[in-house]
């Protein structure tokens, strides 16, 4: 142990010396941090390794005989399932799909999970929660599961009741890697959960990977204790003494306890509580929530912090008296607002600041990594201790993942409809609604809810329907070229293509790329100078860098310079002719200067006075890069204008010319 520590210290000293030498040799250009191998990190699979494992797990391609011929054929099945071009090749879109987080159940029939289209032969179904995740307090977990069951009871005769002892129809638990059912999880990301079809034994049981960060989909959920806002949730970011905080802090306290504000402005409202910490309380165990007692003795060894010793599941625990060996009283340590995920620290919190390769880091960093993931050290000096973990991200909505898994527990298989809850890939949806495809599937098994009054008329269509490009005339909400691809927006769906000559692929959920957007947008354009996508919906707009929403958005249209009377934008585009952005609403348009970040004077103007033959109340406008033309869309048709002369050179059908129908 001493030799290893000396070796690491010597290595750290050498790295610091090299860093100092680099600074002396040339301060003009700071060298990027070298990519290193983090202890406990899982090495990423090659594309071929990923494909073989993916097709074996989800499409039944045997590992030992999944040769190139079989692989190609199975790849086409997978590509067809996800609406991808059926190339049979490991192209970029196929690999991207395989790397997305998803349910662990297969996409084709697997008789271990779904023997003979099973269903429950009763409408009263019981469930029991065996274990909890430390990421959320028990009340939030209970509520998420109850709401997930209600998704299905709202549209069927099924009724779900919770029991606290004995064998329930659906047993719910959290676990890591191999957890007792022969279908192991795979660490952070990848497989999120799985469930078995209705039946005896494990039938209906639902398991959730506890290496994932469980949230409600929008970052860590932190319910405070004590203070003057007991039981409320932290508000991140919050403002204290004129500074913004994005996590719990001990700033302003001398006792070291972490706290947060439950409103944005603590300076104004003064509402706060203490963040979960083992010094305040524990979860589960047998100590009824009593806090940890440090130091405590376990098997003759003294511990002054939470530990995973004595456990095979990796959960952090502590004794709640000074001698566990004598009293046998313990509890699990709650996750703090800066608890890490993955790494080699078993969920220990970040320690900020920390030293890495001789440099001090005041916040999470991607230094040293090739994948860009944010991480932190869990001691003050990574170079000496090499203890680390990934920083909390948005996490995975326990409600959405559970609602999907409980669909399997009712007998539903995966859906090819990307708008369905039962689609295999996880996509966070802020305003969730069960799709028509989901409702149709569950009602084929159990019938409609007796609470749904259909009256004497025809049965109504329940839930949103995923549109099909060539089977109906779609009036698009927006069309834009973003990062070189043409995107077509309709309600919560998008289609994408590189050129108008190719049939767009999709649909995909808008939330796949831009999760914070509302279900329906009014307009979209890309600022090519900054490569930012700007979306309009109602009287607000959103600005994204790639898939990251810029801080402070959405903002009102008035902050862009539009008058208060404009409550909706019809279309917008950045014109390559003069690099200005044009915003259309009704019969008027405005011109926005992207460099000066303000509207040009002399606007609005009437569309009819400035644009040749262009109608009012447009649906979308796009200027394709390097094409020399702009395209104005309304209804099922479009008008093509030559940029220099503003002459109309073509009037055509969107369906035939842009959608390949």
Swiss-Prot record:
Region: Collagenase-like 1, residue numbers: 111-222
Region named Collagenase-like 2: 398-466
Record: glycosylation sites: 574, 643
Binding site residues for Ca(2+) 4: 477, 522, 570, 619
Domain Fibronectin type-II: 229-277, 287-335, 345-393
Swiss-Prot/TrEMBL cofactor(s): Ca(2+); Zn(2+)
EC number(s) per entry: 3.4.24.24
Lineage: Eukaryota, Metazoa, Chordata, Craniata, Vertebrata
PTM notes: Phosphorylation on multiple sites modulates enzymatic activity. Phosphorylated by PKC in vitro.
Binding site for Ca(2+) 1: 135, 210, 212
Region (Collagen-binding): 223-397
Any one GO molecular function term: endopeptidase activity
Main location: secreted
Keywords in alphabetical order: Angiogenesis, Calcium, Collagen degradation, Disulfide bond, Extracellular matrix, Glycoprotein, Hydrolase, Membrane, Metal-binding, Metalloprotease, Nucleus, Phosphoprotein, Protease, Repeat, Secreted, Signal, Zinc, Zymogen
Native species: Bos taurus
Binding-site positions, Ca(2+) 3: 186-187, 209, 212
Reactions the enzyme catalyzes: Cleavage of gelatin type I and collagen types IV, V, VII, X. Cleaves the collagen-like sequence Pro-Gln-Gly-|-Ile-Ala-Gly-Gln
Function noted in UniProt: Ubiquitinous metalloproteinase that is involved in diverse functions such as remodeling of the vasculature, angiogenesis, tissue repair, tumor invasion, inflammation, and atherosclerotic plaque rupture. As well as degrading extracellular matrix proteins, can also act on several nonmatrix proteins such as big endothelial 1 and beta-type CGRP promoting vasoconstriction. Also cleaves KISS at a Gly-|-Leu bond. Appears to have a role in myocardial cell death pathways. Contributes to myocardial oxidative stress by regulating the activity of GSK3beta. Cleaves GSK3beta in vitro. PEX, the C-terminal non-catalytic fragment of MMP2, possesses anti-angiogenic and anti-tumor properties and inhibits cell migration and cell adhesion to FGF2 and vitronectin. Ligand for integrin alpha-v/beta-3 on the surface of blood vessels.
Location in or out of the cell: Secreted, Extracellular space, Extracellular matrix; Membrane; Nucleus
Similarity remark: Belongs to the peptidase M10A family.
Motif mapping: Cysteine switch: 101-108
Gene Ontology terms: cellular component: extracellular matrix; extracellular space; membrane; nucleus
Protein name per its UniProtKB record: 72 kDa type IV collagenase
